[in-house]
Amino acid sequence: MSSGKIAQVVGPVVDVMFASGDKLPEINNALIVYKDSDKKQKIVLEVALELGDGMVRTIAMESTDGLTRGLEVLDTGRAISVPVGKETLGRVFNVLGETIDLEEPFAEDVDRQPIHKKAPSFDELSTSSEILETGIKVIDLLAPYLKGGKVGLFGGAGVGKTVLIQELIHNIAQEHGGISVFTGVGERTREGNDLYWEMKESGVIEKTAMVFGQMNEPPGARMRVALTGLTIAEYFRDVESQDVLLFIDNIFRFTQAGSEVSALLGRMPSAVGYQPTLATEMGQLQERITSTQKGSVTSIQAIYVPADDYTDPAPATAFAHLDSTTNLERKLTQMGIYPAVDPLASSSRALSPEIVGEEHYAVATEVQRVLQRYRELQDIIAILGMDELSDEEKTLVGRARRIQFFLSQNFNVAEQFTGLPGSYVPVAETVRGFKEILEGKYDHLPEDAFRSVGPIEDVIKKAEKMGF
């Protein structure tokens, strides 16, 4: 094990000098430095650059407070390694695989794997054409998720990405019954804490591993924590041949941390100040999140859209890797429609008659056509009013508004805020409900009866209470 000495510390960047005869550590190797003589407080550094003349530049995974020039640094000879396997279930980790819950820490001999790996080769991959039912009407009807697929939840600040991902955990993890891995990347610690206790109460935690590198962590930890969660998921897929659910909240923070690290390493910034290696870093992460012939990884990733600008390089780079996109729209939150999923901007590779069936496909495309026509007519309505529309257009607008409201529903995880119980709607019920609205079966019911309900039967009950 070769050793060097700290030459300089600039925030989370630490330069380490190795003696001229010593072997330099490889890129991505983990180095250890002890802050105190008792060797109780250690900091892990990851090699990022070799500067020449025995000097390497590293990124710290923890705060560098207390580090001084001249402290001894040890090369572990391998990348950061984290615990994997059944022992990880029900536990909460940081980027280094250290437990941060109140339970006993792991034994030294627990099975560990490095966080840096190659993506599976082309001949190992497998694809699926089976739909993953979420119980959320707008998703199941218009942008269905594939088992073993990759899903992105796009949205600006405060439009409901985390609530939607928590509802998906509630619905899918409980129904799925398999193994889930939740990775919190640069998000609020409070949300992670709430999620942990909710999962503990519901019992889902027994089949879930949680990894957190939150907003208060150094950029190195936020950049690598997604790889830690992914390594745990990969083990279940490859070694235990499981079907794994991988939740990541938020992929944008991974890019943001990469941008901070890139600037600290002295690289020239690229478009909008992002790192020049943005596409490479995103590709290396996303290509590992895939399904192989041994098992599947279904990943659901929240992706923050800065200033609601979808052309920003961070969300635009993530788009290319996804099977389904669920776009959250601020205008819908202003109308009180939750989840605020844009039915026309969201898309899915799975929405084809071969995968979802002829009836589902026909209903979904007709719903999109009606909503698109309503959007085109809104300018006329705003300027001239409803009276200028033909009878056929008036009927279409009425149905479009009912569809728009019926695409909303109450969430189980939001019950504490709304006071209303959440609903899980099977796909068959969703398709039947929208088909009947399109046929004009409920044209006589008030539009408000369609707002925030579950299946179509709830609309009828709500209308009866309103006196219709």
Swiss-Prot record:
Highest taxon above the source species: Bacteria
GO cellular component, one term: proton-transporting ATP synthase complex
EC number(s) given by UniProt: 7.1.2.2
Residues where ATP binds: G155, G156, A157, G158, V159, G160, K161, T162
Similarity remark: Belongs to the ATPase alpha/beta chains family.
HAMAP family xref list: ATP_synth_beta_bact
Record's function text: Produces ATP from ADP in the presence of a proton gradient across the membrane. The catalytic sites are hosted primarily by the beta subunits.
Protein name: ATP synthase subunit beta
Biological source species: Streptococcus pyogenes serotype M49 (strain NZ131)
